[in-house]
Amino acid sequence: MQQSTFEKIYEVVKQIPYGQVATYGQIAALAGNKRWARVVGYALHANPDPDNIPCYRVVNKEGRVSDAFAFGGGNKQIELLKEEGVEFINGYVDMKKYQWERPIY
């Protein structure tokens, strides 16, 4: 059975380690198409299982959280990331320290 685009995205997001973040573009590339960054946003907004698909670990390429975070807004996303030990500098995730280092094949 072939996976849908959203299923591919969810499988990648499930792999983001506790205490780390990934970018929309990074998730898109790992899911099979580097141009899917906006689609990643749509998929995360439609997340069917937020307890097992940690969409709050996905941030933009500068390390900013989404004001449109579907499950409580940007403040909730920041709260969840801080609970995992992710640090923010002037409202941005320190990407050098917390970005998931997953090779893109």
Question: Can you say where each PLM-predicted feature lies in the sequence?
Answer:
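Nucleic acid-binding interface residues in structured DNA/RNA-binding domains
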Residues: 1-105
